[in-house]
């Protein structure tokens, strides 16, 4: 038996032996070192050898305020000394109350009720359960189904995974929760119709939701789950008028609109809540990641007064909760993180610089492997193709060889941590910390240009 307090000198080997990494093909590291990050500062991270990398993904769309914010660490320390833990099961504590009020103030319309979770998948799970129980309390028990979009990722809990539109991700865990149905997403680059008319395409895409509601029966559909900008597949922004039409459809058929903003909230697109940027008011917002910039885990489902109302009547109870939901340390860090957002005006910084980021990435269009550059705010995807004219994508063999076998590793070795993703057509995803400026954009573009040029030679 080893000494339990001994510190391993070979973190990489110990990681392979004991740390089961998430969404990771573990055999890749049987004879290769596990990348090990030990420190962060601003827009950069550093590995155990001291090498610096630009964090082009904010960890995992999380570290919005940047790395190394000592005041957030100090906030966590002080809160842990005062009240390290207490649940919000029939009790309150000050930081949960204050953060709930703050989120309600930021949220649009009458979204004033905040149900805390510990992460985004749990927030989505909460929203579906809440929608189901809401309609039961309203005397409409057959309304339990949900509609979401093809290739969309909404989390890994059983319900959230059902809402997810990635068959390969779901197959190992079937049967999943029944009642989750899919419609086309807003990928205009590969639009089956109206590819040259964004407004018409948006109307068509929204109308597919209506068609699915009518096909299933409005009396059976509880909610529609949509990300403001869809992540999986490579950053699909909404076409003009899309969300306004979706809101009309949901109102017409008494269906709840859930804005899944686990990635898009807290400045990623230049507003605290992304629904504000696109001009719609949902019935619920799910959020997490950037709420604390990752300095402590927390998530939330923010609910309109109208939807919360029956749960506040008589003996009714929302029969759901999490031990660590609304954790005092996380709530305190969330408040301090939002203080930074306001003091440094990070949302306006994103709005002021998003066009410069896009323009810099669009320089890559001169590379034969780059088919599309799309996104919003500080959230972009670069779709890779074999043929610009036909938009021909990679074969499975080419994806394995070029995307996994070369691109992911080469970007990292060249000093850029980001994501090469094939949950749809192959894309490189970028979401740097919100403090990023033109120098960051130029560094990203330079590394991408070098590595994508090499990748093209390997096709």
Regions found by a protein language model. Give the residues of each.
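Conserved N-terminal phosphate-binding loop of PLP-dependent enzymes in the Aspartate aminotransferase
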Residues: 2-459
């Amino acid at each position: 038996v080893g000494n339990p307090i001994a510190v391993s000198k070979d973190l990489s080997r110990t990681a392979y032996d004991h740390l089961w990494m998430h969404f990771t093909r573990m055999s890749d590291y049987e004879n290769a070192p596990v990348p090990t990050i030990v420190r962060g500062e601003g827009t950069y991270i550093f590995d155990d050898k001291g090498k610096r990398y630009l964090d082009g993904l904010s960890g995992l769309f999380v570290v919005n305020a940047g790395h190394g914010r000592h005041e957030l660490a100090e906030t966590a320390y002080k809160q842990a000394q005062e009240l390290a833990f207490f649940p919000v099961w029939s009790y309150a504590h000050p930081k949960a109350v204050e953060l709930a009020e703050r989120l309600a103030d930021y949220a649009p319309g009458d979204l004033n009720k905040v149900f805390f979770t510990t992460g985004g998948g749990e927030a989505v799970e909460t929203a579906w359960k809440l929608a189901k129980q809401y309609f039961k309390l309203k005397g409409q028990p057959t309304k339990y189904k949900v509609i979401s979009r093809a290739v969309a990722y909404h989390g890994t809990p059983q319900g959230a995974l059902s809402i997810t539109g990635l068959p390969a991700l779901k197959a190992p865990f079937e049967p999943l929760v029944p009642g989750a149905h899919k419609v086309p997403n807003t990928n205009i680059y590969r639009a089956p119709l109206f590819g040259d008319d964004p407004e018409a395409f948006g109307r068509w895409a929204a109308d597919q939701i209506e068609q699915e509601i009518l096909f299933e029966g409005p009396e059976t559909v509880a909610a529609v789950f949509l990300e403001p900008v869809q992540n999986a597949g490579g950053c699909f922004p909404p076409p003009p008028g899309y969300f306004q039409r979706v809101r009309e459809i949901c109102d017409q058929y008494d269906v709840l609109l859930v804005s899944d903003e686990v990635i898009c909230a807290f400045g990623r697109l230049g507003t605290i809540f992304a629904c504000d940027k696109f001009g719609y008011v949902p019935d619920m917002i799910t959020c997490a990641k950037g709420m604390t910039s990752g300095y402590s885990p927390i998530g939330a489902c923010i609910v309109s007064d109208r939807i919360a109302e029956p749960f506040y009547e008589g003996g009714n109870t929302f029969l759901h909760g999490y031990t660590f939901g609304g954790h005092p340390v996380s709530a305190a860090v969330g408040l301090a993180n939002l203080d930074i957002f306001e003091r440094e005006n990070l949302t306006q910084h994103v709005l002021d610089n998003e066009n410069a980021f896009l323009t810099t990435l669009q320089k890559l269009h001169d590379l034969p492997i780059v088919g599309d550059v799309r996104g919003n705010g500080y959230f972009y995807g670069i779709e890779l193709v074999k043929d610009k004219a036909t938009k021909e994508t990679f074969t499975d063999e080419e994806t394995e060889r070029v995307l996994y076998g070369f691109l992911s590793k080469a970007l990292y070795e060249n000093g850029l941590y980001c994501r090469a993703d094939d949950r749809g057509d192959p894309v490189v995803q970028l979401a740097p910390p919100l403090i990023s400026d033109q120098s960051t954009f130029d560094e990203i573009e330079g590394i991408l240009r070098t590595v994508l040029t090499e990748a093209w030679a390997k096709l």
